[in-house]
């Protein structure tokens, strides 16, 4: 009978003072309110080791994502396709795109990333994996639990009577009319997958779909309310905790948050309460092994002139353009130059238990998460987004017609929706 083991790892990825935050689009690091972490688990005993990692950064794009994944794969003695790296997406944190930073340096634009700091984070995270493997503990059970989160998530896109976006409800929304509007389409549930050695909990992995910011732009580095809820839970239980962002591309706390400083603690406690409730509701099941499967997807680029390399190059090389616009142009060019490299969409299925974890790239809209659940109504579907963030937002095709913020910066074409849903359905299918 197979024997399964679980290793846990973590490393500090807090940037030094002065480091750009959110890709250089906001105030750089002026202080640290709480440290940033890269946290992960390694599942051992299957075909190949599987690595799941969550980083308290805004994002990892293109080559930055691939470098991080490759390093963890080598450390865990597996292949990159069996490694899933995701970002929690708080904004007072680094945003890494190695190729974009090289373009920025060549154009003598303000930096978006310290490449030496990034390489050091990758190296130390891989070292943490290597050090964790000898400490792996036997794993006998997997658990699942679900709890409703009260008064955190709301849809960012508030539509008017004409079907167009009337209000963009950002993470900190001060407009009383926008805040008074209904929550809109969200997934109100936090989901928890846990690993056990008989009655001893080894790790708890949580996911919830929402931008995790209470306030940002002040240069104060923080994992913000979702990371703080995770750490509060770890301190009170002594159990290793991870938090993943679900398909929160069009979801924020804007209905319940005006950016007041005290709201960070309030939102933290609401997420924490759901973590506690999901843990209490956990149902443990014997572990019969797992299957890891993945499919490649080649994303199609936007065709509008503003998204072309030629137009992006003009902005990048314009010394009079704002730093945020120049950096964004570099991100667009880096994306166009990697289109020949597909992105793997992954699924982890725990055999004979109807438990599936779906791992997606980018800032996927909540519609993808809800669609995945409808595809497998017989199963517990744990959806994680914010993997390779090269394409940025992944809206629905309809969203491009409705307007709003996300379609103005999404780098993949509207037909992405059909392509991605097709891949998700194949991965989640019992017949696969």
Where are these regions (language model features)?
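Conserved beta-alpha junction segments in alpha/beta enzyme cores
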Residues: 1-240, 246-251, 256-266, 279, ...
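Anionic-ligand-binding alpha/beta catalytic cores of soluble enzymes and soluble regulatory domains
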Residues: 271
